[in-house]
Amino acid sequence: MAPCATGESAAMHLAGASKTSTINASVLHGPRDLRLERRTIEDPSIGELQVAIHTTGICGSDVSYYKKFANGDLCACMPLSLGHESSGVVVAIGPQVTGFNLGDRVALEVGIPCGQCGICRKGRYNLCKRMKFRSSAKSVPHFQGTLQERINHPATWCHKLPDNISFDAAALLEPLSVAIHAVNRAEPTPGSSALVIGAGAVGLLTAAMARQSGCSTVTIADVDQGRVEFAIAKGFATHGYVVERPLHSSPSCSSMYSPSSSGTSTPLDGVMTPASTLSVSSQFDYARSLAADMLSLTASDPSIYSDEEEADGVDVTFECTGKEVCMHTSLYATRAGGKVIMVGMGTPVQTIPMSVAHLREIDILGIFRYANTYVTGIKLLCASERARKAGKAGVSGGGCLLPFLDQMVTHRFKGLENADRAFELASKTVDPEGKLVLKVVIEA
């Protein structure tokens, strides 16, 4: 069920007729046509809070809109403010809102379901057909994103933050919620093995959540060596695998990798054929070989697998890229009776070796955004932060504590006038100085 904006603290309500004021907003008018504009904003209405946006993280879908004025099949048809990974401060409180005070720090859950349909009543409100999601072109008129100085947002979907959670970590609650939802769908048992394909923000957070849920080994794979090394060094995953980028001519054959002391695999010699030029059967062969290489990182460790049959695959694979070849690899890398969780949204129509899943009873589960996750995310962040400040690390309950998420923010831009620079950088994996780019944030 949806959270409620109720509580014991006395709220300060606005009285009298609604007033308007002007704010700055970053508005996308077309591909790479980002403009700083003045907009009017009214006082919050019944059930709303007015939130001054402090921090907004840039998501891959935002970058897609910025580059193409579209995200997959969703094409924007009017000016759109981007941004949906956000935290801020309550600056005004509308009528009939309780549980909030001016100055409260909040994280924003930006998907607004109808709350009335059968799927909402069942608690799976992320699947509501009438969902309005900020920065998405799905609803018309578009539901404007958070790259604005202030927004009015339903209090029900504003989550109060404890003092020990930073604005950066609070903004990351949105992609963390995707990871929480993915792991909730997977339901791994303590001691399970997991593979995460894709080491972007969602992949990193999914790996961290897999460890937190009790998975004893979590291997993360990506084409970017810097991201894989970050995942291992910062405790997001236990093992790492670097996949050779297509069309690279010097390092690497996909089946020739050497584990390093850091727990990361790096390419040796050879040349890889781009998957797009292969026949379907050859693509499957390539994915099968890639899966075998990934599994070889942990297959010989007796502390992980009790018998040879278990070494045939991981208990659960989280596919966080949406790429067809990665879905193939996920199926081949998962043991009989295991699960593949489709996290990334990419190629809408794919040719999949379904018999691999059918004959080995591999469950394929999709996820879409998240539901009922923010309270869990806040509790996990609090526990991690308390342990960090106490100089402690390690396990909590059934698994590991979350890593310090603030370290995922590698680049910061101040002011909405710099949003275009932020989007250009967010589309890269390294900055002009050669430093790793993970999460880029904009402070309004």
Per-segment meaning from a language model:
Residues 2-20, 254-255, 263-265, 303-306, ...:
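C-terminal hydrophobic helical "lid"/dimerization subdomain
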Residues 203-204:
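N-terminal Rossmann-fold NAD(P) dinucleotide-binding loop
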